Structures are given as structure tokens and as C-alpha cells.
């Protein structure tokens, strides 16, 4: 089972409730994006050929996750706290807004739940926050903007697919 943090029509960032691990679940058949903090049943695909080897959190699902309920932000805390990105480390292992695709080896995370100490500001499709004494302005994916709470405290940062040889940091969910 999954605690969905955010996503799109063919993927979601989630916490696997059985293991507590952060996962980027992907599936073939499109479905409406699941709202953050949705509890969903997953069916892991036997063949993981769709999983990207440089994205250690990738998991291929046989079917889209099936929503079975929702939880509150307060209840989700017990699953979110252990997967928070360490504040001593750069976002996704790199200080800049992008990572050269050829440098990705699968040893650094490609998905992170971030709790910026100064909060998050969202305006004009960008999330602005400070992390390690650097102000970041990352694009927010449209489904995340649609489902954003009024005052987000956390965000889910992931890497975009490669574009011009780089994977860009984007905000996949606002919590």
C-alpha cells in the first residue's frame, strides 16, 4: 500500500507503507492524478524493465494505484518524518537546479521530501525556498499546483526526464 504524495497521470511519488521507503511509482495506463495524502493499493509489476536504473526509487506497477482512502497531514507525519531529506545535504545530491544526466549513477536520490526551515512560497508556477543558505526557485508541476494546500510546509522534489543532457529539479508535490 502507498501514501501518495503527488504525481501525474502515469506516475506518483509515494511512501510505501510496508517498508516506509520513498518510491516513484510508474504505470502504463493513464489515470487521473491522485491527490496528495491519498492511501492507495499498489500492484507491483513482475517485470521491472520500465524502472529507470539511475533513479533508485523507481518502481514499475502493473496497474495504476487504486485509491482506498485519505489521511490527514497530521497522521501522515509518522511516515513523512523518517523520509525527510537531511538538511546537511544538497537537494538530490547536487547544489544547482540541474544535474547532467550522464553523472547519474543511481547512488544519489532522484526524489526527496524537503522541509525548508524558512517555509515555501509559491508564485507564478514556482516554489521559492531556502536550503543550505541558498534560495531555490524550482518549477512546480501543474498537478502539484492544482492540489497545493494554502500554506505548504514541505515539498517533494524530483528530477525531470533528461532534456538537452540535463535532468532538472522540479517540485512534484506541495504538502
What are these regions (language model features)?
Residues 9-35, 99-115, 119-156:
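Beta-strand/loop nucleic-acid-binding surfaces
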Residues 43-102, 112, 130-175:
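OB-fold/S1-family single-stranded nucleic acid-binding modules
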Residues 1-75, 79:
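Long alpha-helical, hydrophobic tracts
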Amino acid at each position: 500500500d502507498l501514501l501518495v504524495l503527488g504525481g501525474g497521470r502515469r506516475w506518483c511519488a509515494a511512501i510505501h507503507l510496508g517498508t516506509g521507503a520513498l518510491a516513484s511509482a510508474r504505470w502504463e495506463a493513464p489515470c487521473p492524478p491522485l491527490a496528495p495524502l491519498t492511501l492507495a493499493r499498489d500492484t507491483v509489476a513482475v517485470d521491472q524493465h520500465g524502472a529507470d536504473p539511475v533513479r533508485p526509487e523507481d518502481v514499475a506497477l502493473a496497474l495504476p494505484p487504486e485509491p482506498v482512502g485519505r489521511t490527514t497531514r497530521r497522521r501522515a507525519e509518522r511516515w513523512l518524518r523518517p523520509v525527510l531529506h537531511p538538511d546537511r545535504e544538497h537537494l538530490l545530491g547536487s547544489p544547482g537546479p540541474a544535474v547532467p544526466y550522464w553523472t547519474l549513477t543511481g547512488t544519489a536520490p532522484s526524489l526527496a521530501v524537503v522541509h525548508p526551515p524558512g517555509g515555501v512560497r509559491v508564485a507564478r508556477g514556482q516554489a521559492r525556498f531556502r536550503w543550505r543558505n541558498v534560495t531555490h526557485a524550482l518549477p512546480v508541476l501543474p498537478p502539484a499546483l492544482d492540489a497545493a494546500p494554502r500554506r505548504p510546509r514541505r515539498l517533494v522534489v524530483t528530477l525531470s526526464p533528461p532534456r538537452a543532457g540535463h535532468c532538472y529539479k522540479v517540485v512534484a508535490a506541495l504538502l
